[in-house]
Amino acid sequence: MISKFSLFVEIGRVVVINYGEYINKTAVIIDVLDQNRALVAGPHSGVERHIINFKWINLTPLKVNIQRGARINTLIAAIKAADLETKIAALSAVKKINARATKSNQTDFERFKANLIRRKLNKKVSGEVKKLVNIANRAAHKKAVAQKAAGHVKKTL
């Protein structure tokens, strides 16, 4: 049977912490302690080596090649060898976290300017949609008139 899961909890898996002291930071699983907890460390993001519950982490597709229970210096070397910093920055989860942080740090005037830009864009899009609908309606009307003239009237309810 083929599994529908593609991400597994394993040694070296990069995770994003979603709860607690290190929220929105990335770490690497160093050891799996039991069915609920793992030992993680994130020297690249300031996460100290500690035990964390699986409910507090989100798995990412990235994986570092390390041994079980690796020391911090070994982990740092593996992170540098895998060029993990750039790969982490390209993750969609990290991009969402950064976007949410910048949006929450906006001033009132910046929110106002963004709202104006959004309104202007929506007005352009809705105008183009109206033009396309109008063209489609005209074509349908011409087709109906042509069919009526030919004697093929199709009634719709």
From Swiss-Prot:
Entry GO CC: cytosolic large ribosomal subunit; extracellular matrix
Family statement: Belongs to the eukaryotic ribosomal protein eL14 family.
Keywords carried by this UniProt record: Ribonucleoprotein, Ribosomal protein
Highest taxon of source: Eukaryota
Organism (species): Dictyostelium discoideum
Gene3D superfamilies linked to this entry: 2.30.30.30
Alphabetical GO biological process terms: ribosomal large subunit biogenesis; translation
GO molecular function terms listed in the Swiss-Prot or TrEMBL record: RNA binding; structural constituent of ribosome
Protein's UniProt name: Large ribosomal subunit protein eL14
